[in-house]
Swiss-Prot record:
Location relative to the cell: Cytoplasm
Entry protein name: Co-chaperonin GroES
One GO process term, biological-process aspect: chaperone cofactor-dependent protein refolding
Keywords: Chaperone, Cytoplasm
Domain of life: Bacteria
Gene Ontology terms, MF aspect: ATP binding; metal ion binding; protein folding chaperone; protein-folding chaperone binding; unfolded protein binding
Gene: groES
Provenance organism: Helicobacter pylori (strain G27)
GO cellular component terms attached to this protein's record: cytoplasm
Length: 118
């Protein structure tokens, strides 16, 4: 099923957490903490055509009590506001799209982090 987030939102599939500890103890599903990282599966048009800070396939970190859970075709997803994303894992900069050529940090901040203007 296709899902297109609206506003400044992204659709995220949580990354699976390990089922056992480093010492080999198996953790039952009901005792596991839900992971705070996931893979972006879809972004709203406002993000994809605006700041482009997050794109499909990015691994992101997000706040523990953020977003709304939905189920699509039997798979659990999170719908998160752009402002609830803490960062992109494994990326040196949110300008990883390669479309930016900033010489000063203030230009970078204005372009990539002032989402309300885009």
């Amino acid at each position: 099923m296709k899902f297109q987030p609206l506003g400044e939102r992204v659709l995220v599939e949580r990354l699976e957490e390990e089922n056992k500890t480093s010492s080999g103890i198996i953790i039952p599903d009901n005792a596991k903490e839900k992971p705070l990282m996931g893979v972006v599966k879809a972004v709203s048009h406002k993000i994809s055509e605006g700041c482009k800070c997050v794109k499909e396939g990015d691994v992101i970190a997000f706040g523990k009590y953020k977003g709304a859970e939905i189920v699509l075709d039997g798979v659990e997803y999170m719908v998160l506001e752009l402002e609830d994303i803490l960062g992109i894992v494994g990326s040196g900069s949110c300008c990883h799209t390669g479309n930016h050529d900033h010489k000063h940090a203030k230009e970078h901040e204005a372009c990539c982090h002032d989402h309300k203007k885009h």
